[in-house]
């Protein structure tokens, strides 16, 4: 049997009518697209993916969440240049799924949570700076004072304990003398009999700042650690 020349086969294949499904796959995987329609699809996809992954602001994100969100934003923009929408949506979905899985694992394991997210560090205790922790966190005294001012604190001596949280925010507990007057305090002044009852109730309350130093988590469900 005589074999057909290779060039003849190429010409026959080029002349065939393309399969509609092949055209659709080629269109979604890298073909030319309308710029306006492409941009709208990417915006909607980005909003949906970020909505699924969480509603935290950038200031409240941990380092892992920030890296993933920046990566998603970078990936979503790529089709504008590379014209590959289908692969982009898959990659962004993978990033989002990875973030959700990582957060689920952190809820199940304290060790992995500390490794990926970190834990709160005490930076001020009884009006004194924790120099070593400040060095580890690469936080200067000026930056710490700025955070204190944003919380309305005018003197470090008024701070009983201050912690730098995993998301970069500062948690502050003031000394008893520096705390603002509350309804509980007014009841103590107006109703002397309330002091004993309130004292008993207050002694049973757990201070969430104790969890940082003493690792006390008695009231936290096991599912949330």
From Swiss-Prot:
TM ranges: 30-50, 66-86, 87-107
Biased composition range(s): Basic residues: 215-225
GO CC annotations, alphabetized: plasma membrane
Membrane-topology descriptor: Multi-pass membrane protein
Biased composition (Polar residues): 199-208
Subcellular locations according to the entry: Cell membrane
Domain of life: Bacteria
Pfam families according to UniProt: DUF421
Annotated region (Disordered), positions in chain: 197-225
InterPro entries in UniProt: DUF421, UPF0702_alpha/beta_dom_sf
Key words of the record: Cell membrane, Membrane, Transmembrane, Transmembrane helix
Primary site of residence: membrane
Family: Belongs to the UPF0702 family.
Protein name as annotated: UPF0702 transmembrane protein YdfR
Species in which this protein is naturally found: Bacillus subtilis (strain 168)
Gene of this entry: ydfR
């Amino acid at each position: 049997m005589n074999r057909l020349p290779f060039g003849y086969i190429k010409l026959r294949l080029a002349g065939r009518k393309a399969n509609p499904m092949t055209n659709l796959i080629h269109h979604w995987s890298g073909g030319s697209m309308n710029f306006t329609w492409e941009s709208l699809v990417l915006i909607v996809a980005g909003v949906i993916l970020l909505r699924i992954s969480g509603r935290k602001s950038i200031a409240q994100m941990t380092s892992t969440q920030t890296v993933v969100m920046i990566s998603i934003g970078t990936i979503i923009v790529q089709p504008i240049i590379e014209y590959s929408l289908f692969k982009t949506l898959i990659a962004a979905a993978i990033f989002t799924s990875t973030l959700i899985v990582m957060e689920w694992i952190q809820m199940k394991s304290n060790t992995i949570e500390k490794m990926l997210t970190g834990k709160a560090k005490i930076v001020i205790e009884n009006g004194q700076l924790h120099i070593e922790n400040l060095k580890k966190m690469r936080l200067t005294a000026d930056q710490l004072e700025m955070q204190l001012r944003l919380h309305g604190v005018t003197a470090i001596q008024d701070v009983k304990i201050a912690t730098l949280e995993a998301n970069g925010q500062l948690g502050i507990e003031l000394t008893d003398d520096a705390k603002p007057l509350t309804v509980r305090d007014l009841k103590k002044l107006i109703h002397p009999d309330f002091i004993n009852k309130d004292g008993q109730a207050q002694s049973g309350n757990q201070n969430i700042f104790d969890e940082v130093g003493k690792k006390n988590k008695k009231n936290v469900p096991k599912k949330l650690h």
